Swiss-Prot record:
PROSITE patterns: ZINC_PROTEASE
Cited Gene3D superfamilies: 2.60.40.2970, Collagenase (Catalytic Domain) (3.40.390.10)
GO BP terms in the entry: proteolysis
GO CC annotation: extracellular region
Annotated protein name in UniProt: Neutral protease 2 homolog BCIN_12g06300
Highest taxon in the source lineage: Eukaryota
Binding site residues for Zn(2+): H305, H309, D320
Amino acid sequence: MRSFSKILAVASLAAIANSAVLKRDNNVLEVTLVAGENAVVHASVKNVGAEDLNLLSYGSLFDTAPVQKINVYEGETAVPFKGVLRAIQRTDLAPEVFHTLAAGETFETSFNAAEVHDLSTSTYTFVAEGAIPFAKAGSTEISDSIIFKSNAITVSVDGEAAKSVAKAIPSSIDRRTVLQSGCSTSQRSATTQALSYCASLARAASTAASSGSSTKFSEYFKTTSSSTRSVVAARLSAVASQCSSLTSGSTKYYCTDVYGYCESNVLAYTIPSTNEIVNCPIYYSALPALTGTCHAQDRATTTLHEFTHAPATYSPGTADNGYGYAAATALTSARAVLNADSYALYANAIYVGC
């Protein structure tokens, strides 16, 4: 897997924030994109429902971090995302991780897609799509997810101008700095255990995807097609391989916050462009090593979740299209196959017997 020289070089973890019930009416949030200069996007989110909403900011248009706010396509091909994918604790959420959007209120933001995508001179399609977990106004307990999809905009990009935009994530970081902040004895022990459990869970889930119950597979991936089962099995097998070694592999695993994205309730995060995975302090303090409860979070499935994000594990890497059982099982098959939590939830279900 990688090497434990203060950094736990290897691959993954992180489970993510999410909702519990089912998706709401797609029309509750009206998301609109408008093209700005070159790769700049102006986005608005309007609450067109009758109730105030407390929306989880992480991983959405409300997030100030370089997260995947839009999907970028060149023709039919998705342009790789080069920002950060953060895993969020689903319980005991802090008030500051939410954005309250009153009924009838509109939130506006602008960002440059070139900060987290490599764009050349070409024509691209930008669209925002996903599921935002929310709590009732005044509460921080996730009650459901809202599925949304914006209009698609066509953008002509000047490649030279796009290249001049500073990247949100550098291509590499100072390894000496990483080596100065290493794993404690307890962190190393917890991470090693999580990796071992991750390998076992991923291996069992891979076998189940190949030849197990088609009904159970369809529950999480919305199809029983042999081609999709093969892809899911292969990705899980690759995760098992990465989790099985501490001294070799294609990803790097850190016990400390080398990029500075461990904010409130963040368990871990992945930088897909560099195949780096980072544990946050609450990964160790808030999660059990392995849960026996259906669809609950633990260190093992958080690690499995993060491994699927890294394209070096299996390409393409997954995204965070839906957090938690309710949102993940509301996805289409095409989006579920590229959703990290779908793999974590499926592996948990196979292990627990959900």
